[in-house]
């Protein structure tokens, strides 16, 4: 069965590198990029480009549409990155709402066999001064008081969406 890797944020640093490595392995790749993003020029030429907006559930649904007999694996790298607090609403809309839209689209497309979410170290709750942060291997409830900054909060909230079952039903 043919597999297509669906990569969001493909015009960003992480997404571009994910696309390049998948192509190097010989995989087929479809990239979700924001319409009009000038950084699309960095996406490898062999990648199928899909222009859309993560805040649009319809665009996310279209991104997952494939020919019968094709399975997909989604690697969700996309996020808005800023430390400017004036963009807090947009950060939540893109990073949390966009992730929720992608998860819903994946759930609506049974040919999507895996959904891989790229989070951030910022999503890890901060500990009191002097305590060491250790790898998190299980669900850690989101705590607004322990995640500092809107970008980190948005990534922590989006991560929580990915931990919330069921992804498949």
Per-range role (PLM):
Residues 4-25:
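N-terminal Rossmann NAD(P)H-binding glycine-rich loop of SDR-like oxidoreductase domains
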Residues 8, 32, 74-78, 115-121:
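SDR active-site strand-loop-helix element
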Residues 15-16, 96, 156:
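Residues forming the Rossmann-fold NAD(P)(H) cofactor-binding site
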Residues 17, 21, 105, 161:
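Rossmann-fold NAD(P)-dependent oxidoreductase module
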Residues 27-36:
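Conserved glycine-rich Rossmann-like NAD(P)H-binding loop of the short-chain dehydrogenase/reductase
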Residues 38, 47, 51-97, 101:
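NAD(P)H-binding glycine-rich loop region in Rossmannoid oxidoreductase-like domains
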Residues 100-150:
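Conserved Rossmann-fold NAD(P)-dependent oxidoreductase catalytic core, especially the SDR/UDP-sugar
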Residues 146-169:
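Active-site Tyr-X1-5-Lys
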